[in-house]
From Swiss-Prot:
Organism field: Salmonella typhi
Region (G5): 206-208
Similarity annotation: Belongs to the TRAFAC class translation factor GTPase superfamily. Classic translation factor GTPase family. CysN/NodQ subfamily.
Taxonomy of the source species: Bacteria, Pseudomonadati, Pseudomonadota, Gammaproteobacteria, Enterobacterales
Protein name: Sulfate adenylyltransferase subunit 1
Domain of life the protein comes from: Bacteria
EC number from the UniProt entry: 2.7.7.4
Segments of this protein annotated with the region G2: 92-96
Binding residue positions for GTP: 34-41, 113-117, 168-171
Pathway assignment: Sulfur metabolism; hydrogen sulfide biosynthesis; sulfite from sulfate: step 1/3
């Protein structure tokens, strides 16, 4: 067992008291990104090592692994704490997204270590999609590179507002202040083109030697700012979803017995309380909240991010993929939208193609109408293209098969973010972020044949646990 952890548990008065204290700490999700060999995995290993998060058996194993796979000579290769795949260790690179967890007295952390190679940009986008902060590593010898720009743009595109530019390997440039100042100026010049109001901070460090990671460096007395760990512990994360209206995508209809019917999911934004009037989209039917069931029992009110089951006062037709919002809110369903896309498939994205798309719990089909432009990562300019290649980032116009309740991604990532799924292979081939909604062309009501209506009624009557929707949109429930 970790000796420091044992001391912390003892100081809190036992395991139960320690666990309660952990629950009340704030959580920060962050990722490390940047160009290949900039030291991302080594930095995470250093954070884990210097915050005493490594168990004795892990440390012993690390000594042995460093001798077999290490790239640092006689020193501990801290990157091996994170690079777990055999191919990663053999090549000395990160391929998959690796997640690590640690905590200090002030905060809990979830780290996503993302790959630096261009061909794994899609893995990096996956890691960034759930993070609040990005650490962008820059090799002090190389300065700002294409992958640095690419990862910076993807991070901001995915809604990350806090960027920490960690200028690493300062030991290899003799800890020179002018090197740090030059790279800082270069990055700030580039960052003027990034979207959004960003909080950008700079820390000169050496992940290998531990300078300015968890402790102040004696080699860079010219730097008087906080260490990287101090930045992570004190940064104030303001989540946009906390200030947005209530959105609750239904993930699952929970019906363990005939006397209970609840709608499970994670509250995407805002808050909801018992007695509040809510509206269901797309049907528009209204009801009120009777109970809010959580893992810790019933609650009177919950906020964004909590996993809950809502029980309503009325037995109405609600299925997976429906969206619950406050009754006084208006959210017009849209069939057309402009979507920022990070493309992840070998086959390019081109106009005329159709894909399954998944938005929260909702799955439908969409058609690519046009590729507006592709972003040139080198200078963030827009260029006309006929298709979007693997790892390409651009803006596309799409039409959905049915009207969808969507939000702008920067306002609500859950109800404004979607993934593209290949209809034949069922493989995720792209990620999309809603930029603009186009409510043109009101969709005429769908006309169903007599056979379709009879079959729908039969299914709802004899198989109520399937939660089939009434095609005519009646307000009575399926049960």
């Amino acid at each position: 067992m970790n000796t420091i952890l044992a001391q912390q548990i003892a100081s809190e008065g036992g395991v139960e008291a320690w666990m309660i204290a952990q629950q009340h700490k704030s959580l920060l999700r962050f990722l490390t990104c940047g160009s290949v060999d900039d030291g991302k995995s080594t930095l995470i290993g250093r954070l884990l090592h210097d915050t005493l998060q490594i168990y004795e058996d892990q440390l012993s194993s690390l000594h042995n692994d460093s001798k077999r796979h290490g790239t640092q000579g006689e020193k501990l290769d801290l990157a091996l704490l994170v690079d777990g795949l055999q191919a990663e260790r053999e090549q000395g690179i990160t391929i998959d997204v690796a997640y690590r967890y640690f905590s200090t007295e002030k905060r809990k952390f979830i780290i996503a270590d993302t790959p630096g190679h261009e061909q794994y940009t899609r893995n990096m986008a996956t890691g960034a999609s759930t993070c609040d902060l990005a650490i962008l590593l820059i090799d002090a010898r190389k300065g700002v590179l294409d992958q640095t720009r690419r990862h910076s743009f993807i991070s901001t595109l995915l809604g990350i507002k806090h960027l920490v530019v960690a200028i690493n390997k300062m030991d290899l440039v003799d800890y020179r202040e002018e090197t740090f100042a030059r790279i800082r100026e270069d990055y700030l010049t580039f960052a003027e083109q990034l979207p959004g109001d960003l909080d950008i901070r700079f820390v000169p460090l050496s992940a290998l030697e531990g300078d300015n990671v968890a402790a102040q460096s004696a080699n860079m007395r010219w730097y008087s700012g906080p260490t990287l760990l101090e930045v992570l512990e004190t940064v104030d994360i303001q989540r946009a979803v906390d200030r947005q209206p209530m959105r609750f995508p239904v993930q699952y209809v929970n019906r363990p017995n005939p006397d209970f019917r609840g709608y499970a999911g994670t509250l995407a934004s805002g808050s909801v309380k018992v007695g509040e009037r809510i509206k269901v989209l797309p049907s528009g039917v209204e009801s009120s909240v009777a109970r809010i069931v959580t893992f810790d029992g019933d609650k009177e009110e919950v906020c964004a991010g909590e996993a809950i089951t809502l029980v309503l006062n009325d037995d109405i037709d609600i299925s997976r993929g429906d969206l619950l919002l406050a009754a006084n809110e208006t959210l017009a369903p849209a069939r057309h939208a402009a979507i920022d896309v990070v493309w992840m498939a070998e086959q390019p994205l081109a106009p005329g193609q159709s894909y399954d798309v998944k938005l929260a719990g909702k799955k439908t089909r969409a058609r690519i109408e046009a590729i507006c432009y592709q972003i040139d990562i080198n200078n963030l300019t827009q260029r006309d293209v006929e298709s979007l290649p693997l790892n390409g980032i651009g803006l596309v116009e799409m039409t959905f098969d049915e009207p969808l309740a969507l939000d702008i991604y920067q306002q609500n990532p859950v109800t404004g973010g979607l993934i593209f799924i290949d209809r034949l292979s069922n493989v995720t081939v792209g990620a999309g972020m809603v930029r603009e909604l186009d409510e043109r062309g009101a969709t005429p009501p769908v006309e169903y044949s007599a056979f379709e209506l009879e079959l729908n009624a039969l299914v709802r009557r004899h198989f109520p646990h399937w939660d089939a929707r009434d095609l005519l949109g009646d307000k009575h429930g399926a049960a």
